[in-house]
Amino acid sequence: MIKQRTPKKVIQATGVGLHSGEKVLLTLRPAPVNTGIVFRRVDLSPVVEIPASYEYVGDTMLCTTLHHGKVKIATVEHLLSALAGLGIDNAYIDVNAPEIPIMDGSAAPFVFLIQSAGIREQNAAKRYIRILKPIRVEENGKYVQFLPHKGYKITFTIGFEHPVFNDRPQTVSFDFSGTSYVKEVCRARTFGFLSDYEKLRECDLAKGGSLDNAIVVDDYRVLNEDGLRFESEFVTHKVLDAIGDLYLLGSSLIGAFEGYKSGHELNNRLLRELMVRQDAWEYTYFDTENYLPAVHPEYYPVEA
């Protein structure tokens, strides 16, 4: 049986919020079986819980933001990506601010945090969503789609006519039956254009944004002194984002996802379209260790 997983112990990290620029304390806690991933605004009284579910997604302008009434938690996608990549099914995530810290702009610090906490298997079967029929959402020349597939595969294409992008890969495809999320995906940082950051600052946003937590591009070049971590870092970050957004289904996927110039909004619309098309998917479980159709097949050692 492929079992559910949770962090082994409580662990904390601090960072700055991308938009507020304020210090954020994040606490990762173990959770019982079938809890799912639950965010908790512990700076509020009473504490407000927001499940990591596509149904709670509100704003998708610059990141994925979860809403529960007037309470929100923004920039959840990188942490969710790390949780998905390490196969964590159940966890409480306490934050004392309305956004998850941006860290270095990738999911790698969250992967390190989870690995440091350790991972424990739980006595319940892990649930998967298997894609049975193609589902597609498109708008203004952009699209996202699910396709049936025996494992988990993500293909993404960006399309920037820009000197920095023209000489680098703008399409990548990862089949996670043979790809390591930790080694090949989680280190890809978020990116943006200097002109956009200047506009955001004028709107009192991105106050925590810097060259320490994003790749910044001007009209001709990458401004970060150390450059890119690898040549396909731009488009690979879009895969990282998609893995986090798709984990808002509340289960790991068995199927293929394709994104073409898409972002958080289309990703969420695809999840909503999938869930109302009940003939296009099914829940499934695995009672054998011989087949691990998950985001990250190289599961880290766990303790029961």
From Swiss-Prot:
Domain of life from the UniProt record: Bacteria
Keyword GTP-binding set for record: no
Pathway as given in its UniProt record: Glycolipid biosynthesis; lipid IV(A) biosynthesis; lipid IV(A) from (3R)-3-hydroxytetradecanoyl-[acyl-carrier-protein] and UDP-N-acetyl-alpha-D-glucosamine: step 2/6
EC number: 3.5.1.108
Catalytic residue positions: H264
GO biological process: lipid A biosynthetic process
EC main group: hydrolase
Cofactor: Zn(2+)
GO CC annotation terms, alphabetical: membrane
Keywords: Hydrolase, Lipid A biosynthesis, Lipid biosynthesis, Lipid metabolism, Metal-binding, Zinc
Binding annotation for Zn(2+): H78, H237, D241
Reactions it catalyzes: a UDP-3-O-[(3R)-3-hydroxyacyl]-N-acetyl-alpha-D-glucosamine + H2O = a UDP-3-O-[(3R)-3-hydroxyacyl]-alpha-D-glucosamine + acetate
InterPro entries xref list: Ribosomal_Su5_D2-typ_SF (IPR020568), UDP-acyl_GlcNac_deAcase (IPR004463), UDP-acyl_GlcNac_deAcase_C (IPR011334), UDP-acyl_N-AcGlcN_deAcase_N (IPR015870)
Family that this chain belongs to: Belongs to the LpxC family.
Functional summary from the UniProt entry: Catalyzes the hydrolysis of UDP-3-O-myristoyl-N-acetylglucosamine to form UDP-3-O-myristoylglucosamine and acetate, the committed step in lipid A biosynthesis.
Name recorded for this polypeptide: UDP-3-O-acyl-N-acetylglucosamine deacetylase
Originating species: Legionella pneumophila subsp. pneumophila (strain Philadelphia 1 / ATCC 33152 / DSM 7513)
Gene (UniProt): lpxC
